[in-house]
Regions:
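Short, charged surface segments at domain edges that flank catalytic/cofactor-binding sites
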Residues: 1-15
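Cys/His-rich microdomains that often coordinate metals
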Residues: 20-27, 60-63
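Short beta-strand-alpha-helix junction that forms the catalytic/metal-binding core
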Residues: 14, 39-60
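Cys/His-coordinated zinc-binding microdomains
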Residues: 20, 34, 57
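Short flanking/linker segments adjacent to small metal-binding domains or redox-active Cys/His motifs
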Residues: 85-128
Length: 128
């Protein structure tokens, strides 16, 4: 959710990085540039997850057109060297401990709440 809501404008609209379709962030998905099953190192990194419409994320990536467009978007946004480094390092292991996950989750929740307030969709916080 963080990838979608942080990319949204103040009205909650976001653009698919593959096809350019605009929709509300709740109707989009977080598409992984390097698929989750291919890299434990990049699976939870923000640079690897960006808004995609369901068509591109679920079907387009399988047929090549969305993945090609995603690659071009990544190179334009981060630069070719960064993207090449991502691809070269996708086999690296990522060892996270329970505390790492807890800290990451806390950070993600805080940042999501910030963006919900920005968009005007603030939900009450829960303890825990």
């Amino acid at each position: 959710m963080l990838a979608r809501i942080s990319a949204a404008d103040d009205n909650g609209w976001v653009q698919c990085v593959s096809c350019g379709k605009k929709d509300h962030y709740k109707d989009m998905q977080g598409g992984h540039f390097i698929p989750k099953g291919h890299s434990s190192y990049w699976a939870l990194k923000e640079e690897n997850v960006h808004p995609q419409c369901p068509g591109c994320n679920m079907f387009g990536m399988r047929h090549g057109t969305a993945s090609q467009a995603y690659t071009i978007w990544m190179q334009d946004y981060y630069g070719k060297d960064f993207v090449q480094n991502m691809l070269d390092s996708k086999g690296l292991p990522m060892k996270l401990y329970k505390k790492d996950y807890e800290d990451m989750l806390k950070d993600f929740r805080e940042r999501i709440r910030h963006h919900e307030k920005r968009i005007g969709e603030c939900r009450p916080t829960t303890n825990g």
